[in-house]
Amino acid sequence: YIGLKISNALQVLRGEKTIGIKLNEVSQSYPVYVDGIPYIYKNDNYEIQMKQMIAEFAILANSFVGEYLKLNLDGKGIFRTCEAKELLSNMYNLSGNELLNEIIMNGIQAEYLSQNRSHDLVGMPEYSHFTSPIRRLSDCVCHYLLKYIYLRKNDNNLIIPFSNDELNILSNRCLYAGKNMKKIQYKDIKFRLIHTMFNMLLTREDITLTYFITSYSGLFLNLIICKIDDHDVHMSYTIRSRKFNGEINNHHKSVKITKVKCLQTYDEGCIPELERHILENP
């Protein structure tokens, strides 16, 4: 209970600096497997509160470490940044889901830098990734730098473990690895959601998909499936077409589908009724 009160207070403080806290309103459903059978699950209120509490404490720790590195290493280190204050300033009246859609449409993304910059989505002037050294390289680098700062108090001749050039290289590697892992994660989510939809259609006639279109290159039409029936989800999907002449915006459209096919190398053909609906009703 005390932890929840503290995390709520931290969220209020962040809310004075960023509209990014509205993303806490977004609670997406996800596939879970029971005895090998997938179904779609939505966290209950208690689970949502616990996850938000953990997230707030992680943000506090990451921002504290980011500031500590900046102050003790003359602004150098490895920082998680997202300079988007100007874009975000036009989105104050949006809901959490609407904000998420705008972030996707505008390509707002965080990156890693070896020089400190603000992270406007979390509302912090300094921010690092520190809390997960088991799974992220950037967090390991932060731990090495913190250890160096601690040890040099007793040894002024101690050499910093990474040069400025090495920190820059590591930042770029972290950025590349992070993007690569997200691609893998998106494919994994897509596979599991398609598997879940297939399983749902074994016991019912249809399901309703809600989607919006994010971009069109002249060949590849990219969209986000944001709802399966009443479940909020986030699933990217790409269709190949040279004849699309519809609008590119985050206006939601819906379609009922009665079948899905196994995910292949490309998305095309997995949800044929969705593809036909989009191309025939641009």
Give short role names for the model-derived ranges.
Residues 259-282:
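Internal insertion modules embedded within essential enzymes
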